[in-house]
């Protein structure tokens, strides 16, 4: 398939893919890959949540929910995940790069006291250097109204060496930072990944995981339970398992809702509450993440 979302993975991710078939499915397209033909899904195209249109409130800032905003900090990742929601936005997304652009985002938030939660996303914010990462964190953490600054990164999985003691120390200073990450199979919880998580957690930074339910990766109860146990043992809180988003080009990963419900039920019968995430779908136009 000719694609505008090329395969890319850093050295660590390529090494992991060489020993984990489940992870490799997230790194490489199969030779037979092609866009799905499901009209109900394909109608959403490459930007199902309107991030280039109605959700964009000022340059690089997206707001879909009243109490939180998302800042586009980067258009690069350590790996181009094949199930990426923003796969169609490569090279098109508005990314905050300049001081004036960041100031405009801060002013937007300051003018809306109901906003209490800022998501620093992309791309992956940790593709930036420490100084740039902290420029974003500090700008929003300094606002009294902001209670949570979420650093949204898959680096713990795709390039865990990026999480250094120095970075963890800097992120911990405000007391407002949470790290949101993504692990989709137990193979991804390597010694390096666990060490990266520990550096953050030992500094008092909560680490939470938003997994994606992916056909051929984690779409069975035993595989999902194994993942959730691995996350809990690494002190990473599994709090969401998402259905694939309604974006073109990822049809091969979709899992039927009934199968997802069965996996959720069996996980609930096998694990304690701390290890149980909510299984949800992110539906364009909905006011919340929708339980399946």
Feature-to-residue mapping (PLM):
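Conserved AdoMet/S-adenosylmethionine-binding subsite of the radical SAM
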Residues: 103-113, 117, 123-271
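A secondary-structure boundary/capping signal
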Residues: 73, 121-122
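Flexible, acidic/Gly-rich N-terminal and inter-domain linker regions that tether
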Residues: 1-63
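Active-site glycine-rich loop that binds ribose-phosphate moieties when present
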Residues: 20, 26, 97-107, 135
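Short, charged beta->alpha transition segments
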Residues: 55-59, 69-72, 103-108
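Canonical Radical SAM [4Fe-4S] cluster-binding loop centered on the CxxxCxxC motif
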Residues: 63-99, 151
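Auxiliary Fe-S-binding modules of radical SAM enzymes
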Residues: 1-24, 229-292
């Amino acid at each position: 398939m000719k694609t505008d979302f090329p395969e890319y993975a850093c050295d660590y991710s390529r090494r992991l893919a060489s020993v984990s078939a489940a992870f490799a499915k997230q790194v490489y397209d199969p030779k037979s890959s092609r866009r799905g033909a499901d009209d109900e899904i394909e109608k959403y195209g490459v930007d199902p949540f309107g991030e280039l249109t109605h959700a964009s409130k000022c340059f690089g800032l997206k707001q879909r929910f009243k109490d939180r905003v998302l800042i586009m900090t980067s258009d690069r990742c350590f790996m181009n995940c094949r199930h990426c929601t923003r796969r169609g936005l490569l090279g098109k997304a508005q990314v905050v790069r300049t001081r004036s652009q960041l100031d405009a985002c801060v002013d937007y938030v300051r003018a809306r006291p109901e906003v209490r939660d800022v998501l620093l996303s992309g791309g992956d914010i940790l593709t930036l250097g420490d100084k740039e990462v902290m420029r974003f964190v500090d700008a929003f953490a300094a606002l009294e109204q902001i209670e949570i600054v979420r650093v949204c990164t898959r680096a713990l999985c795709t390039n865990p060496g990026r999480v250094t003691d120095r970075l963890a120390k800097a992120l911990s200073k405000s007391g407002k930072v949470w790290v949101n990450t993504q692990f989709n199979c137990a193979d991804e919880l390597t010694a390096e990944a666990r060490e990266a998580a520990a550096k953050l957690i030992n500094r008092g930074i909560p680490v939470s995981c938003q997994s994606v339910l992916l056909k051929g990766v984690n779409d069975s109860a035993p595989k999902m339970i194994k993942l959730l146990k691995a996350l809990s043992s690494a002190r990473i809180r599994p709090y969401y398992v998402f259905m694939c988003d309604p974006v073109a080009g990822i049809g091969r990963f979709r899992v039927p809702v009934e199968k997802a419900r069965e996996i959720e039920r069996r996980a609930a019968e096998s694990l304690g509450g701390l290890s149980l995430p909510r299984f949800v779908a992110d539906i364009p136009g909905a006011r919340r993440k929708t339980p399946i």
